[in-house]
Curated annotation (Swiss-Prot):
This is Zinc finger protein 30. One of its GO terms (biological process) is regulation of DNA-templated transcription. Residues 6-78 form the KRAB domain. One of its GO terms (cellular component) is nucleus. It is found in: Nucleus. May be involved in transcriptional regulation. Belongs to the krueppel C2H2-type zinc-finger protein family. Transmembrane segments: none annotated. SMART domains: KRAB (SM00349), ZnF_C2H2 (SM00355). GO terms for molecular function: DNA binding; zinc ion binding. There is a cross-link at K155 (Glycyl lysine isopeptide (Lys-Gly) (interchain with G-Cter in SUMO2)). PANTHER family: ZFP14 ZINC FINGER PROTEIN-RELATED, ZINC FINGER AND BTB DOMAIN-CONTAINING.
Length: 533
C-alpha cells in the first residue's frame, strides 16, 4: 500500500486591525477563549515541549492579536527540509502543504480529536516542532496516510470561524433554557452558567472562572506590570479594550444607541444588556428558586445571597460580603489600617482609589464634562447623576409609595421613612441614623474635621456636597428651574421642596396627630408641641 506524507505548516496569520475593529466585544472575547482553550488542548496532546505562538502570548497579556499579523508567509528553510528528509518524514513525492492559521488547526484538533483530526481516519497524526531561528518557532503537523489518497481539504480563512451563519441561523441550542447560538463554542461557554462549572483556577488566589480568557484577564491583577492606567483619573484596568471603553467617559463619547428609546452607551455590551429591558429577556435562571435575571452578575449575586456558605463573613462583627475584596476592605475598619496618605494634608485612606479622588480636592481637577451645560466633575459617577437632571431620568422606584429617585442612596434613605428604622448609632451622642453614610457625616461634627476648603473665601466644610452648594453663592449659579413657575434655585433640594407647593405633597406625617408637612424640619418643629404637652 502506498505511503505519502502530508505536512501542515503553522504560520502567523491573524486579524488585521480593520478586521479586529469590526468584531464586537463579545466576538473578541469568544476569539480569545477559543484561542486559549484550544492551545491548552494542543499542549495536552503534544506535551509541554511545544513552544507558545506569539498570538497566544499577546492574548494572555491582553494585547490585540492583529499586532503580529505578517503580510508574507514564511517558507521552510532548506536546512530544515533536509533534516526532515533525513528522518524519512518528507519524501520528495506526494507531499502536500496546506497553510492554516494557528487557531484553525487548534480548533479542528479540538473538534475532531487527535486521531482523525483535520483529514479523517486514514491518517496517522504526529506533531513535530522545529526552530528555524531564535525569533520564530513553527509547529509541523505531519500526517502519514496508508491509503495513498490525496487528502480532501477545503481551506477556510480565519474569519470564517467567526462569521455569522446565513440568515441569522442559530443551530446550537441550550437544552436547559432554549437559548440558541451561532457558534458551538458559545453554547459550550453558556452551558457552564447552568452547570456552575468553572474549570480555570487562579494559582495565586484560588479564584475560578468559566472561561480561560477571564482567568488570563484576572491574572493580570497579580502581575502589576501588565495593567493599563488611565492618564486622566489613574484608574487601573487589566485589559486595553476596557481602558479604551473607560476613556470614552472622559470625552463623553457614547457611540452605541438604543433604537427603542435613544439612550446611548459607551460600550456595546452595555447596550446589549440595556436592550433586555425592552425585550423582557431574562436568560439567566436560578436553579434553586427559578427566578430569572437579565445579567449573569445578578444571578451570581442572587445565588450567593441564598447560599450562606458562599458569603465572606467578618469574624469581628459578623457582617457578610459577596466577595473577598469587600471583606478585606471592611476588615480595615476594625484594624484602623489606612496605608494611603495624602501628601498635601496628611489624610489617610483605606483604598488607593479613595486617595486618588481626594487629591482632586487639592488639585481642582475635574476630568468629567457635561456636554449639555459644560459643568465639570471630579468623578464619573457625579457626572452620571448630574446628567439625569437634564434627561429627567429617575430609575429608582419606592415600592411603597411609587415615588422615583435619581440616586439609589436617595431611595434607601427615603424607604427609612416608611419603616422608621435607624440602625446606626453615634457612640459620642447616641443619635441614630438610617444610613451608615449619614452616621459618618455626623461623626465629623464631633471630630471637628472640615477637609473641604473654598478657594474663593477660605471657608471650610465637613462635606464635599456642602462645599459644592456653597460655591454657587460665589458664582451666582441657579441651575435648578421649576417647570411650573420658572423660579430658579441654587440647590436641587430647594427645588424639590418648592415643587411640593404646586403638587400639594406633604410626605412628612406626625405619628401623634397625623398632621402632614412639606418639609421634614416643619415636622420636627411641630413635634415639640407634643413633647411640651
Amino acid at each position: 500500500m502506498a505511503h505519502s506524507t502530508v505536512m501542515f505548516r503553522d504560520v502567523a496569520v491573524g486579524f488585521s486591525q480593520e478586521e479586529w475593529e469590526c468584531l464586537s466585544a463579545y466576538e473578541r472575547d469568544l476569539y480569545r477563549d477559543v484561542m486559549l482553550e484550544n492551545y491548552s488542548h494542543l499542549v495536552s496532546l503534544a506535551g509541554c515541549s511545544i513552544s507558545k505562538p506569539d498570538v497566544i502570548t499577546l492574548l494572555e497579556q491582553g494585547k490585540e492579536p492583529w499586532m503580529i499579523v505578517r503580510a508574507e508567509k514564511r517558507r521552510w528553510s532548506r536546512d530544515l527540509e533536509s533534516r526532515y528528509s533525513s528522518n524519512g518524514l518528507l519524501p520528495e513525492k506526494n507531499t502536500y502543504e496546506i497553510n492554516l492559521s494557528p487557531w484553525e488547526i487548534m480548533g479542528r484538533i479540538q473538534r475532531r480529536g487527535p486521531e482523525d483530526s483535520l483529514l479523517g481516519k486514514d491518517f496517522e497524526y504526529k506533531i513535530y516542532e522545529e526552530q528555524e531561528n531564535s525569533h520564530r518557532v513553527y509547529f509541523r503537523h505531519v500526517i502519514k496516510t496508508t491509503s495513498g489518497k490525496r487528502p480532501r481539504y477545503r481551506k477556510r480563512t480565519p474569519v470564517s470561524l467567526y462569521q455569522k451563519t446565513p440568515n441569522g441561523e442559530k443551530p446550537y441550542e441550550c437544552g436547559e433554557c432554549g437559548k440558541a447560538f451561532k457558534v458551538r463554542q458559545q453554547l459550550t461557554f453558556h452551558q457552564r452558567i447552568h452547570t456552575g462549572e468553572k474549570p480555570y483556577e487562579c494559582k495565586e488566589c484560588g479564584k475560578a472562572f468559566r472561561q480561560c480568557a477571564h482567568l488570563s484577564r484576572h491574572q493580570r491583577i497579580h502581575a502589576s506590570d501588565k495593567l493599563y492606567e488611565c492618564k486622566k483619573c489613574a484608574k487601573i484596568f487589566t485589559c486595553s479594550s476596557d481602558l479604551r471603553g473607560h476613556q470614552r467617559s472622559h470625552v463623553g463619547e457614547k457611540p452605541y444607541d438604543c433604537k427603542e428609546c435613544g439612550k446611548a452607551f459607551r460600550v456595546r455590551g452595555q447596550l446589549m444588556l440595556h436592550q433586555r429591558i425592552h425585550t423582557g429577556e431574562k436568560p439567566y435562571a436560578c436553579t434553586e428558586c427559578g427566578k430569572s435575571f437579565r445579567q449573569v452578575a445578578h444571578l451570581t449575586r442572587h445565588q450567593r445571597l441564598n447560599s450562606g456558605s458562599s458569603r465572606h463573613e467578618c469574624k469581628e462583627c459578623g457582617r457578610a460580603f459577596l466577595c473577598s475584596t469587600g471583606l478585606r476592605l471592611h476588615h480595615k475598619l476594625h484594624t484602623g489600617e489606612k496605608p494611603y496618605d495624602c501628601k498635601e494634608c496628611g489624610k489617610a485612606f483605606r483604598v488607593r482609589q479613595q486617595l486618588t479622588l481626594h487629591e482632586r480636592i487639592h488639585t481642582g481637577e475635574k476630568p468629567f464634562d457635561c456636554k449639555e451645560c459644560g459643568k465639570t466633575f471630579s468623578r464619573g459617577y457625579h457626572l452620571t447623576l448630574h446628567q439625569r437632571i437634564h434627561t429627567g431620568e429617575k430609575p429608582y422606584e419606592c415600592k411603597e409609595c411609587r415615588k422615583f429617585f435619581r440616586r439609589y442612596s436617595e431611595l434607601i434613605s427615603h424607604q427609612g421613612i416608611h419603616i422608621g428604622e435607624k440602625p446606626y448609632d453615634c457612640k459620642e451622642c447616641g443619635k441614630a441614623f438610617r444610613l451608615f453614610s449619614q452616621l459618618t457625616q455626623h461623626q465629623s461634627i464631633h471630630f471637628g474635621e472640615k477637609p473641604y476648603k473654598c478657594m474663593e473665601c477660605e471657608k471650610t466644610f465637613r462635606l464635599l456636597s456642602q462645599l459644592t452648594q456653597h460655591q454657587s453663592i460665589h458664582t451666582g449659579e441657579k441651575p435648578y428651574d421649576c417647570k411650573e413657575c420658572g423660579k430658579a434655585f441654587r440647590l436641587h433640594s430647594s427645588l424639590i421642596q418648592h415643587q411640593r407647593i404646586h403638587s400639594g405633597e406633604k410626605p412628612y406625617k406626625c405619628t401623634e396627630c397625623k398632621k402632614a408637612f412639606r418639609q421634614h424640619s416643619h415636622l420636627t418643629y411641630h413635634q415639640r408641641i407634643h413633647k411640651n404637652l
